From Swiss-Prot:
The gene is surA. It comes from Idiomarina loihiensis (strain ATCC BAA-735 / DSM 15497 / L2-TR). Residues 1-26 form the signal peptide. Residues 176-277, 286-386 form the PpiC domain. It comes from the Bacteria. This is Chaperone SurA. Chaperone involved in the correct folding and assembly of outer membrane proteins. Recognizes specific patterns of aromatic residues and the orientation of their side chains, which are found more frequently in integral outer membrane proteins. May act in both early periplasmic and late outer membrane-associated steps of protein maturation.
Length: 432
């Protein structure tokens, strides 16, 4: 009987193994390489996931939703460009660590008035795993760094341009108006033949006619746009007149919310713009904190636990009146810049500090010493001794003018650069 039982058990194991292998093979078959991009690939699973994200995010009406073919084409184009830029990041040694990632995710949640837990729940309920969402955000942050590194060196701004814009800002309130624009780009670069240009312009006019008849701009952007924001419904976000490409600024001047303008010819094609929203200049207020801290740096002979114990001991000494915060900072703090001032960091905006330090000075009550916490610099205790609000509306007009000019020129150069790197890449579709 034992032999029979053993034989049955072995048979079950063999059958289970066979079924498992078949299941694994089936799962592997479900994913495949769709496009080879230089040294990398775009997988079918990536395309499917991006299409599902777009469907969940855009809330298309069933009557006018883009076909899966259209969504797949747009998804492939975005993923090709993403893969090219991620490979560039790898060659440049650009990485995003977990602390940077967590800070970015916290900011995303805050901007949506959500906790991180609520954001996670929303992602999971929409069908995306939290791990996949985190990886998407990490990739976006990496690509942003690649773009800054590659494109900012192509942007040139002269002192005269800055001075001229400062004068314009002071004399013309309109330049402070922000526009939220959406774009549909019909691609046609400077090397296109006359026939290709005419065909692209005809497509742009067809899109305009559809918009005149009431078609949804975001739906048409997903269907027709070659722009990098196509899968976001063409949304370009908020920008001032001087922060947008010159062609756009001239086109939207004096336009109202809901107005559609175009087609506008540029070096990369024909643009159709929609003014989604407008807002005027607002008073800018910034929060500053006056803080002091004691820093203990772990080393080969000083463990993290020991550093934490030392800081807890200092907290007890301060609470009992045995020592003052300033005395302990002068005696023990490893921050040479503040130790001689009793740990005083002066007035500063929280975003000046490391993410963990920023979070701590923003959250603790004034005149309260924090529990020990760590940053990339070591272990700290911190006390906020003051808070104030400053009117920064007129602060640093030169910097504001520079940023507006940089933003405008960066957007123009980014489109050109992305077209260039795509043209230079080896891209091959893989037959099914």
């Amino acid at each position: 009987m034992k032999k029979i039982a053993s034989f049955c058990s072995a048979a079950v194991l063999i059958a289970s193994s066979f079924l498992l292998n078949n299941t694994v093979q089936a799962q592997q078959i479900l994913d495949r390489v769709v496009v080879v991009v230089d040294d990398g690939v775009v997988l079918q699973s990536q395309i499917d996931q991006l299409i599902q994200q777009v469907k969940n995010g855009q809330n298309f009406n069933s009557s006018n939703a883009p076909s899966d073919e259209v969504l797949e084409t747009q998804a492939i184009e975005r993923l090709i460009l993403q893969e090219i830029q991620l490979q560039m990041a790898n060659r440049m040694g650009i990485e995003i660590d977990d602390n940077q990632l967590e800070q970015a995710i916290n900011e995303i949640a805050n901007n949506q008035d959500l906790t991180t837990a609520e954001l996670r729940e929303n992602m999971v309920s929409s069908g995306m795993s939290w791990a996949a969402y985190r990886e998407n955000i990490r990739n976006e942050l990496v690509i942003q760094q690649v773009q800054r590194a590659a494109v900012q060196q192509r942007v040139s701004i002269t002192p005269q341009e800055i001075n001229n814009l400062v004068k314009l800002i002071e004399s013309n309130q309109e330049v402070q108006t922000e526009y939220r624009l959406a774009q549909i780009l019909i691609s046609a670069d400077s090397n296109s033949s006359q026939a290709e240009l005419e065909k692209a312009k005809e497509r742009a006019n067809t899109v305009l006619n559809l918009l005149d008849k009431g078609s949804d701009f975001a739906d048409l952007a997903v269907r027709s746009s070659s722009g990098s924001a196509a899968l976001d419904g063409g949304d370009l976000g908020w920008m001032t007149v001087n922060g947008m490409p010159t062609l756009f600024a001239e086109a939207v001047d004096g336009k109202s919310v809901g107005d559609v303008v175009g087609p506008i010819r540029s070096g990369i094609g024909f643009h159709i713009l929609k003014v989604q929203d407008k807002r005027g200049e607002q008073t800018v207020e910034v929060q500053e904190v006056k803080a002091r801290h004691i820093l203990i740096k772990p080393s080969v002979i000083l463990s993290d636990n020991k550093a934490k114990e030392m800081l807890n001991k200092y907290r007890e000494q301060i609470a009992s009146g045995e020592k003052t915060f300033a005395e302990l900072a002068r005696e023990h703090s490893a921050d040479p810049g503040s130790a001689s001032r009793g740990g005083d960091l002066g007035w500063a905006r929280p975003n000046k500090y490391a993410p963990e330090f920023k979070q701590k000075v923003e959250s603790i009550e004034q005149d309260t010493i924090s529990e020990p916490f760590s940053t990339q610099f070591g272990w700290h205790i911190v006390e906020v001794t003051g808070r104030r609000t400053l009117d920064a509306t007129e602060e640093n007009k030169q910097e504001r003018a520079y940023q507006m000019l940089f933003s405008r020129k960066f957007r123009e150069e980014l489109d050109n650069w992305q077209q260039e790197i795509r043209d230079q890449a080896f891209i091959r579709r893989v037959a099914e």
